[in-house]
């Protein structure tokens, strides 16, 4: 199958029948240049993320939301934005993972059941992929569970392979940890130091530490993989920053990784702008979408006090908050909530109203955030600089946003999105200071 460049339509490769368990067939490598030309094309470097659906530690962890983004989305964003690859692929056996991969712009290789077992290795899946992609010369196997990966890391490794002639490069992190031998009853009754002299314990600043694989990626040329290696030949490591070295394996890793990715993760090519306006849909974001009617036929709605506090905090930080609804909500009822927010109801074209508000405040779209949950919010969500949706938003809204809340609408989603805005604004301010 021919590869497609980044940004082109996604495609799927589907192994037919059982793949060969041996080495891929040797290719007849003619000149990689065009017909009648002696100039060779650069080797085809493909990013490959392995993401089977049968994870035992955390079910479907590859698409579980981490900081509002499917886990696999963090590394796909970094790989696609790096510009280092001729193609970016996800190898999976699961429909939901395939759909998420396509949404982010990756191509999909449907792996066979033979390499989707608990006993299958990464090498098995990579060899199967190469069996169906003769155009690929180098594979960058990127781990979906490393969400703090940045495009610059991948660009530098691609350069090491292409320009410096390395056959394989893998990621490491430097650690300053003293290691001791394990005590085993009947074998070793006392422990011994493995990498230090206890009589001369070095200070951290006086010790270079040691290099450990962090599992973020393994790049290798095709001929090595065909021989059964991901590390070999002219080999080198790439040292990643400690704060970017995150690996998720079990549930306990998740909250730690979430905090790390919010502070050190890669959020895309577009430079973040300071948010000046947040627009929230009323029904399903401010409220849970339920409407109660009193005995005298008056409309009653409820909202979460946490969301009111979130709105107050946003306003205190200088961010205008406005409310919008396509329904003919009672302004009197909304006013009784004492949120002190400008609002528009019975809106048939939300994008037009938000655009008017934006122009009124002299803002560009990148300075506007939007929290929506319905199909009618889709265009606004796609247009603004920062978009979010409650956990129970419709699928159309969720597909259009950059952040999906853990909280449902009317149950803390606004407060959660406010905290997300504050964290991103902190990143903006820090980058400006640098």
UniProtKB/Swiss-Prot annotation:
Placement of sequence motif BC2 motif: 200-206
A single GO cellular-component term on record: nucleus
Taxonomic placement: Eukaryota, Metazoa, Chordata, Craniata, Vertebrata
Disulfide bonds: none
Keyword Calcium recorded: no
Keywords from the named record: Acetylation, Methylation, Nucleotidyltransferase, Nucleus, Transferase
Short motif (BC1 motif): ranges: 15-31
Pfam families per record: CTP_transf_3
Modified residues (Omega-N-methylarginine): 37, 52
Residues that coordinate or bind substrate: 52, 62, 111, 120, 122, 143
Subcellular location: Nucleus
InterPro entries: CMP-NeuNAc_synthase, Cytidylyl_trans, HAD-like_sf, HAD_sf, Nucleotide-diphossugar_trans
Stated role: Catalyzes the activation of N-acetylneuraminic acid (NeuNAc) to cytidine 5'-monophosphate N-acetylneuraminic acid (CMP-NeuNAc), a substrate required for the addition of sialic acid. Has some activity toward NeuNAc, N-glycolylneuraminic acid (Neu5Gc) or 2-keto-3-deoxy-D-glycero-D-galacto-nononic acid (KDN).
BP terms from Gene Ontology: N-acetylneuraminate metabolic process
Pathway(s): Amino-sugar metabolism; N-acetylneuraminate metabolism
Annotated source species: Pongo abelii
Protein name stated in the entry: N-acylneuraminate cytidylyltransferase
